[in-house]
Amino acid sequence: MQNDAGEFVDLYVPRKCSASNRIIGAKDHASIQINIAEVDKVTGRFNGQFKTYAICGAIRRMGEADDSLLRLAKNDSIVSKNI
């Protein structure tokens, strides 16, 4: 959608679950969004960037949120692959 100035504006952009790729609805109050900080490998300090993951309520309800976050962190090389 464009406004009068020709800029693209969206009123609502739905979030998607990072683990299951489902759309997180507005009434899904059990869903979470977590930011995991990226750290410098030498100093161990926060470098100003982070990865954002959204987990829907259905994944949390099944008790799979921790496994899903670990899998996502391994895929993004935040956690080592041999854990």
Curated annotation (Swiss-Prot):
Keywords: Cytoplasm, Endoplasmic reticulum, Ribonucleoprotein, Ribosomal protein. Gene3D superfamilies: 3.30.1230.20. It is found in: Cytoplasm, Cytosol; Cytoplasm; Rough endoplasmic reticulum. It comes from the Eukaryota. The keyword Endoplasmic reticulum applies. One of its GO terms (biological process) is cytoplasmic translation. InterPro entries: Ribosomal_eS21, Ribosomal_eS21_CS, Ribosomal_eS21_sf. Its main location: cytoplasm. Pfam families: Ribosomal_S21e. One of its GO terms (molecular function) is structural constituent of ribosome. One of its GO terms (cellular component) is rough endoplasmic reticulum. The keyword Ribosomal protein applies. Belongs to the eukaryotic ribosomal protein eS21 family. Component of the small ribosomal subunit. The ribosome is a large ribonucleoprotein complex responsible for the synthesis of proteins in the cell. PANTHER family: 40S RIBOSOMAL PROTEIN S21. Component of the 40S small ribosomal subunit. This is Small ribosomal subunit protein eS21. It comes from Ictalurus punctatus. The gene is rps21.
